[in-house]
Amino acid sequence: MAVFKTLTDADMAIFSAGLVAGVDEVGRGPLVGDVVTAAVILDPNRPIAGLNDSKKLTEKRREALFDEICEKALSYHVGRATPSEIDELNILHATMLAMQRAVAGLARTPELVLVDGNRSPAFTHQGLSLTSHSIVKGDGLIASISAASIIAKVTRDREMDALDAAYPQYGFAKHKGYPTKAHFDAIAEHGVFDQYRKSFKPVKALLER
């Protein structure tokens, strides 16, 4: 299938394919917190300049685009899977579940779902089965996936900032829950709490000591 690098080209796809939802995830690698996904249906009549893979944008730019996406999108929804669901299902299946929840929560029914990466779960919306495709590095190629990556990234980063306020000794505002040396040092000193993913090897090893 064609890959569209600009919003103008994506608009053309929307006109031919109907409503297109972009889906992306953030937070598969961290040791703590939910895996967060987002689904976004952009409005071709209200283009958003500067959409890109959220990891390639500054925090200030992501925050500005987050607000613009929320204002201009036809629909968007955040889906998540909790640490307990990640431990029960494994991170891959929990991520697929979170993506399904994001699409199911959209206020509009998309005719096509485009997912960043090389895997796509089966999507339904209000009882209807949806066509979906996965696109490797789609968050840098497809406007709606870029928008979804920004919504998911800003949402999860804000949650890590809130967790940092509650547990400042762990440094979540800096490492966002990822397995850095500073994070390992913090959990070695302070232990883990209920939002940690207990099936992840570093956490599991600590609990088994």
From Swiss-Prot:
The keyword Hydrolase applies. The keyword Translocase does not apply. It catalyses: Endonucleolytic cleavage to 5'-phosphomonoester. CDD domains: RNase_HII_bacteria_HII_like. It is an enzyme of class 3 (hydrolase). Its EC number is 3.1.26.4. Its cofactor is Mn(2+); Mg(2+). Keywords: Cytoplasm, Endonuclease, Hydrolase, Manganese, Metal-binding, Nuclease. Manganese or magnesium. Binds 1 divalent metal ion per monomer in the absence of substrate. May bind a second metal ion after substrate binding. Pfam families: RNase_HII (PF01351). Gene3D superfamilies: Ribonuclease H-like superfamily/Ribonuclease H (3.30.420.10). One of its GO terms (cellular component) is cytoplasm. A divalent metal cation binds at residues 24-25, 116. One of its GO terms (molecular function) is manganese ion binding. Residues 18-209 form the RNase H type-2 domain. Its main location: cytoplasm. One of its GO terms (biological process) is DNA replication, removal of RNA primer. It is found in: Cytoplasm. PANTHER family: RIBONUCLEASE H2 SUBUNIT A, RIBONUCLEASE HII. Belongs to the RNase HII family. Endonuclease that specifically degrades the RNA of RNA-DNA hybrids. HAMAP family: RNase_HII_B. This is Ribonuclease HII. It comes from Shewanella sp. (strain MR-4).
